[in-house]
Amino acid sequence: MEVKPLKKLKLYGFNNLTKTLSFNMYDICYAKTPEHRDAYIQYIDEEYNAQRLTSIVTEVARIVGANILNIAKQDYDPQGASVTMLIAEEHLGPENPDDNPFDPVYTDKEGPLPDAVVAHLDKSHITVHTYPESHPHGGISTFRADIDVSTCGQISPLKALNFLIESFAPDIIVADYRVRGFTRDVDGKKVFIDHKINSIQNYVDRKYRDLYQMIDVTVFQEYIFHTKMILKDFDLDNYLFGTAKKELSINDKRKIKQRLKKEMAEIFYGKNMPRM
């Protein structure tokens, strides 16, 4: 969905508003044996390695209309990965198009960085970190990815929301969006938000709204928007790793379903739950 600016809003100078989208997604599965758990962690570690995450955040930068200044990526031992991308609203490449802006010969030149780069160094960035996790009791394994998209200027991270949902297809999503700082109009009046929003749900495509149950917590006067999403439908086959549903007894299916639903409820509501 398009991010609609406020009508007749003419700004003076640079747009100093900082807009941040925090997108936390969870994937949950049941891995019966230690071998299955290890295989799940290895699968996640390969599926969402630093290279794959880099391609995702690169597409996020393209969607929001940002230019990439620098990328740092890392795979961790025994598992997990992270990518940090520095972005800017305007193109900040070298005057000579044949020069590589990421070449140390170019970036390490003496003298001050361009003003636009300095303005963006600690404001406009995309980061992603992954957290595979399992516990020997109960057979539940989880995977969490945290993506933060922070922009300074006119570009909005909300444009990338649906792409992130599509890329990870998570069981649970916890999304936070906030706007900080202020800019001024041509008359000097402060502007604390420059686009229309009353819920993150405004920017979620209908096809995803139909798939997820969603709840909101909004503190509009503080420009804080919080939305939680959990899949409506539950198919046990989608949560089994290394085991087929047909291999389980009716009693085992019931117990595993209860464990998975309890795990998902605890993650969704952010607290430990009684037996379900």
From Swiss-Prot:
Protein encoded by which gene: speD
Co-factor remark: Binds 1 pyruvoyl group covalently per subunit.
Cofactor: pyruvate
Function: Catalyzes the decarboxylation of S-adenosylmethionine to S-adenosylmethioninamine (dcAdoMet), the propylamine donor required for the synthesis of the polyamines spermine and spermidine from the diamine putrescine.
Catalytic-site annotation from UniProt: 124 (schiff-base intermediate with substrate), 129 (proton acceptor), 152 (proton donor)
Name of the protein: S-adenosylmethionine decarboxylase proenzyme
Listed pathway(s): Amine and polyamine biosynthesis; S-adenosylmethioninamine biosynthesis; S-adenosylmethioninamine from S-adenosyl-L-methionine: step 1/1
Enzyme Commission designation: 4.1.1.50
Name of the top EC class for this enzyme: lyase
Lineage start: Bacteria, Bacillati, Bacillota, Clostridia, Eubacteriales
Annotated catalysed reactions: S-adenosyl-L-methionine + H(+) = S-adenosyl 3-(methylsulfanyl)propylamine + CO2
Post-translational modification: Is synthesized initially as an inactive proenzyme. Formation of the active enzyme involves a self-maturation process in which the active site pyruvoyl group is generated from an internal serine residue via an autocatalytic post-translational modification. Two non-identical subunits are generated from the proenzyme in this reaction, and the pyruvate is formed at the N-terminus of the alpha chain, which is derived from the carboxyl end of the proenzyme.
Pfam family, one: AdoMet_dc
Gene3D superfamilies in UniProt: S-adenosylmethionine decarboxylase (3.60.90.10)
HAMAP family, alphabetized: AdoMetDC_2
One CC-aspect GO term: cytosol
Family (UniProt): Belongs to the prokaryotic AdoMetDC family. Type 2 subfamily.
Entry-linked SUPFAM superfamilies: S-adenosylmethionine decarboxylase
Record PTM Pyruvic acid (Ser), positions in chain: 124
Entry keywords, A to Z: Autocatalytic cleavage, Decarboxylase, Lyase, Polyamine biosynthesis, Pyruvate, S-adenosyl-L-methionine, Schiff base, Spermidine biosynthesis, Zymogen
